[in-house]
């Protein structure tokens, strides 16, 4: 079967890999000049299988209001002039109940745990190097009230069988030795040993090469201009320079899935939530992080690659425009310099921003649509890297008409159309 994948980020390229593995003739198109040029370019680098949590949770509306008034807020809201922004926020608020949280949490954990297994199989199969580490995530709390608040999160971890260890301030240095220098700034910690790290862009670039070896064709600089359909079947996808036909189409366009599929009257509840990152060279390995450190106060993650440190975080709801405000850079620099002052060189940084495709319930959109041959693999929010291989394998199985290894019916767009 001929399959056309829209999007060459980690979701699209991973989908192409599993579709090719299943024996399909696969073509991938993207508007960028290469793979992983947008949301997958410089994300935080966490493979946070264990700490998969919906944004929409009880108490979040109150917390969000408090965050907005911080000098270095983890959440920023700027009206983008659209009614849709308000509609999306209202939808998200409907999921901030204990009942909805449990439903969404179960879906996310199921997807993340499946992705963990897919990464295990993939690495065993390919031996790919993407600067990955399997040394867990260390969440640190700067205030006693944060330690107390974490008890609710720990109860969720226990409910879903996620391994963890609560830490006293001095115990945090067992996992991140460089933090011994700043123990006085830490009130406690939580270690998730099953989490991992890796460079999403490097992974996607390497997977692109493996896909080519399997015969997958890539067409870059292809901006989609039109999608033609006959009844409930997609016929062609047209770009400014080409026309593509396929038996099946997989949409993995991240935030732009919504705008592109609006052409065929599909209403995808995806909003672009902006995140920021800094990448800096390691100057002193002993003073740098070993894996990922998540600063609960600032909602910033600090991740170690081989010779680089990636600092990522924040959530900004302000539309599709990509800007790089110096204030956001200052927040990221403040956190990494406060915890790892001797680890990296802040005079040599790459400052980046990307758009996360977020759904109101924080769960991705995977599977069938009302069109017989149009499938989704999008809407992963902050967990696109974590869920990448699991989502892609699930998508490939659905496209192929195979039984999936995990439940997938409640991940489709239909949950928003009931």
Curated annotation (Swiss-Prot):
<dbReference type="GO" id="GO:0055130">
    <property type="term" value="P:D-alanine catabolic process"/>
</dbReference>
<dbReference type="GO" id="GO:0008718">
    <property type="term" value="F:D-amino-acid dehydrogenase activity"/>
</dbReference>
<protein>
    <recommendedName>
        <fullName>D-amino acid dehydrogenase</fullName>
        <ecNumber>1.4.99.-</ecNumber>
    </recommendedName>
</protein>
<dbReference type="InterPro" id="IPR023080">
    <property type="entry name" value="DadA"/>
</dbReference>
<comment type="function">
    <text>Oxidative deamination of D-amino acids.</text>
</comment>
<dbReference type="Pfam" id="PF01266">
    <property type="entry name" value="DAO"/>
</dbReference>
<dbReference type="InterPro" id="IPR036188">
    <property type="entry name" value="FAD/NAD-bd_sf"/>
</dbReference>
<dbReference type="InterPro" id="IPR006076">
    <property type="entry name" value="FAD-dep_OxRdtase"/>
</dbReference>
<keyword id="KW-0560">Oxidoreductase</keyword>
<dbReference type="GO" id="GO:0005886">
    <property type="term" value="C:plasma membrane"/>
</dbReference>
<keyword id="KW-0274">FAD</keyword>
<dbReference type="GO" id="GO:0005737">
    <property type="term" value="C:cytoplasm"/>
</dbReference>
<feature type="binding site">
    <location>
        <begin position="3"/>
        <end position="17"/>
    </location>
    <ligand>
        <name>FAD</name>
    </ligand>
</feature>
<keyword id="KW-0285">Flavoprotein</keyword>
<comment type="similarity">
    <text>Belongs to the DadA oxidoreductase family.</text>
</comment>
